[in-house]
Amino acid sequence: MIRVGLLGGSFNPAHGGHRRISLFAREALGLDEVWWLVSPGNPLKPKAGMAPLAARLASARKTARRAPIRVTAIERELGTKYTIDTLRGLTRRYPKCRFVWLMGSDNLAQFHRWKEWRNIARAMPIAVIARPGYDGAAIASPAMAWLARYRRSAASLIIRKTGSNRAEWSAPALIQLRFDPDPRSATQLRRADPDWALGFAGPAPRDGLTHRSIRPNPA
């Protein structure tokens, strides 16, 4: 079984902070690799200021270069809009992978607004990575009130071998990861360079999972 961490987001644009938390989580949780799920559109984020998917995927591929990170826009192919539907599609398509959902504490603070958020937690372990300025809201969130009973240490997220040599992680499980805060954010980068996407206007990037080209402004 391949152990995979899933980090979803707009990546508008991707930056070193994404890479750093991914590599940290990979080491802390004993993952084989991390997949960045570049969202075609986040239902909880405004469309204004959102760069084209092809540009965001290209920026993510550049940021993830030479790291055990796969960059994908597979949600577009799956036709999914919400995380729970994406996760169901991934588990069906990749039965030899065992997934853990990675997210920052800013997302935990609003996790209760996500579609079927409890079923997301039941589908796979969730690892929450501290993010400056959001820990208080995350701790006080409705989702944390429910997830707290499932809190586990990173060391407990281990592979259990069964007679069929399959690896299974139990869920729900909440793992809280702490490391030196990374102050970088996509919002700051957009403010500093509103036209950053123009730097990724070259050939259509290839999806790291499907290996198909991601064309600008797909129909």
Specify the residue positions occupied by each region the protein language model found.
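Nucleotidyltransferase catalytic core that binds NTPs
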Residues: M1-A219
